[in-house]
Curated annotation (Swiss-Prot):
Entry-linked PANTHER family: CLCA DOMAIN-CONTAINING PROTEIN, SMALL INTEGRAL MEMBRANE PROTEIN 22
Transmembrane residue ranges: 32-52
Superkingdom of this protein's organism: Eukaryota
Description of what induces expression: Up-regulated in breast cancer.
Organism encoding this protein: Homo sapiens
Membrane topology field: Single-pass membrane protein
Pfam families hit by this protein: SMIM5_18_22 (PF15831)
UniProt function note: May modulate lipid droplet formation throught interaction with SQLE.
Region Disordered, annotated ranges: 60-83
Protein name as catalogued: Small integral membrane protein 22
Coiled coil: none
Subunit structure: Interacts with CANX and DDOST. Interacts with SQLE; this interaction modulates lipid droplet formation.
Length: 83
């Protein structure tokens, strides 16, 4: 699994050649895929930022107390089951 020095140098030269020619992607599909990936990552980072902001800024110091609710029967009584 070790990469030889020649392969590493060839890869570095290829990357440097792409940087010099300002052609980072081989086709427009590569560009579109990269834009979609960046959009996805931006959305994930924005959601994480919102979660952190909500946890840090909107938390109350004490535990929340909710009033107990009265349980109401749900549904309709089936009178056919009555004797």
């Amino acid at each position: 699994m070790a990469v030889s020095t020649e392969e590493l140098e060839a890869t570095v030269q290829e990357v440097l050649g792409r940087l010099k020619s300002h052609q980072f992607f081989q086709s427009t599909w590569d560009t579109v895929a990269f834009i979609v990936f960046l959009t996805f990552m931006g959305t994930v980072l924005l959601l994480l930022l919102l979660v952190v902001a909500h946890c840090c800024c909107c938390s109350s110091p004490g535990p929340r107390r909710e009033s107990p609710r009265k349980e109401r029967p749900k549904g309709v009584d089936n009178l056919a089951l009555e004797p």
